[in-house]
Structure formats: C-alpha cells, structure tokens
Swiss-Prot record:
Keywords tagged on the record: Cell membrane, Lipoprotein, Membrane, Palmitate, Signal
Membrane-spanning segments: none
GO CC terms of this entry: plasma membrane
Alphabetical list of PROSITE patterns matching this protein: PROKAR_LIPOPROTEIN (PS51257)
Membrane recorded as keyword: yes
Subcellular location per the Swiss-Prot or TrEMBL entry: Cell membrane
Origin: domain of life: Bacteria
Membrane topology label: Lipid-anchor
Organism: Staphylococcus aureus (strain N315)
Record carries keyword Protease: no
Protein's name according to its UniProt entry: Uncharacterized lipoprotein SA0403
Family, per entry: Belongs to the staphylococcal tandem lipoprotein family.
Signal sequence interval, chain numbering: 1-22
Lipid moiety-binding region (S-diacylglycerol cysteine): C23
Amino acid sequence: MGYFKRVVLYIIVMVVSVFIIGCNKSSDTSEKPKEDSKETQIKKSFAKTLDMYPIKNLEDLYDKEGYRDGEFKKGDKGMWTIYTDFAKSNKQGGLSNEGMVLYLDRNTRTAKGHYFVKTFYNKGKFPDRKNYKVEMKNNKIILLDKVEDINLKKRIENFKFFGQYANLKELKNYSNGDVSINENVPSYDAKFKMSNKDENVKQLRSRYNIPTDKAPVLKMHIDGDLKGSSVGYKKLEIDFSKGEKSDLSVIDSLNFQPAKVDEDDE
C-alpha cells in the first residue's frame, strides 16, 4: 500500500512539473520581444547621438560619454569628431564643398581641426583642396592660419555645425523610409522625405544659398554594427538636389572614437 502511494505521488509530481514547464515556455514565448524593423533600428542607432542635438556649446561634449568597446585603451576617455559641409555643383561641371571638421579630445579637453574648401572638376583637372587650421576655446572657433579673403575669414570664424542648431529628437516621426542594406560591409542606408516646413530645413535655407524650393530628402548612412561600434561611421545628409546631375546637400556627422592610438597603429 505504501509503495502504491509513492507511485501515485510520483506521478502527480511529474504531471505538475510538466504543467509548470509548459506554462513557463508559453510565457517565455509570449514575452519574447518582437525584433524592430531595420528602419526602426537605424533610427535608434542615430538617436544615440542625434538626441544630443542641438549642442549649442560644443564644449559640453567633453563631458559626454559615447559608445565604448574593446578598441578603447585603458584610461582613454575618447574623442568626439563633429563634421558639417555644404556641397553643390559648380559651373565647371564638378562639385564644390566647404565646411569644417573638429576633433574634441576628452582626455586633454582640447579641440582642433580645420576648415576646408574643395573644388572637384568634371575631368581633365586635379581637384583643388585648401585646409585652414582652427581650434576651439570657450565655444569659439579661432582661425590659426592667415586668410587674405575677408569673406572667407568671416565664414570660418562664424561657422556653426549643423549639430549646434539642428533638432532631430522627433526622428522617429519620419516614416515610410526607403531602406537598403549591404550585409557584407555591413552598411545601412535609409531615406525619408522631408517637408519645407521642417525647422531644420528652414535653418539650412537661412544659412546656405539653396536656390530651389524642392523639399529635401533626409539620408542616413551607417557603416558598422547598428548597436554601436567605435570603428563604425554614421553620416547624415539633407539632400536638396534637383536631379542625378545636380548636387546640393548638407552633410553632417558626429562620431565617438578612441583618442589614444598606439605608435604601431599610426
């Protein structure tokens, strides 16, 4: 009789265990989050930096931490690289672009870079490239090289990066994007139509000579892991171009990378 009770008890325990395990599996399945679409993943990847816009005082970046991985050496606080340029087709059938890149080292709390003027010709002539060294102190761009052209000097000293006045916190509201993926690199691209009523578009029209009423296209490009990578690269472009043979766009990027480099890597 005692043996029979033990057998019955064993069967009851087994049935209850199977029931509990089945419930847990069902719960795990129901609670498993649905993977975001690639469009949403691209937006979220950009949002990690774009949510900081506008960065009115660039020196705030000295206290901003970015994505860190194994590429960073011990003790390296990293470096922010901010970049903006305005590109347009020129009369020679080529491309002219002008802008600035600034490297903000969080270790030394110093910012150095250069303003560039580039002219690319359609054919038969090498491109012209001129760089003018700059540094930033007290959130002010200081020109280090001598510049004879008064208008160019003013453009350099009064330059503002797109990230200083842009507001892309509502990026998630852009929808129906055209997404393309190259898994081999990997790289990701997304395009969204913008409106001329967008405050970011209005800001660009007030700062640059944009001789078209065409509403622009917002283009996002990522090289590397969508979750983040110090060796990856993100670029944002607002394209006002009228057609394939016409270039008119503003390119912006803000990336966080290691500041300290081994001598063997240089």
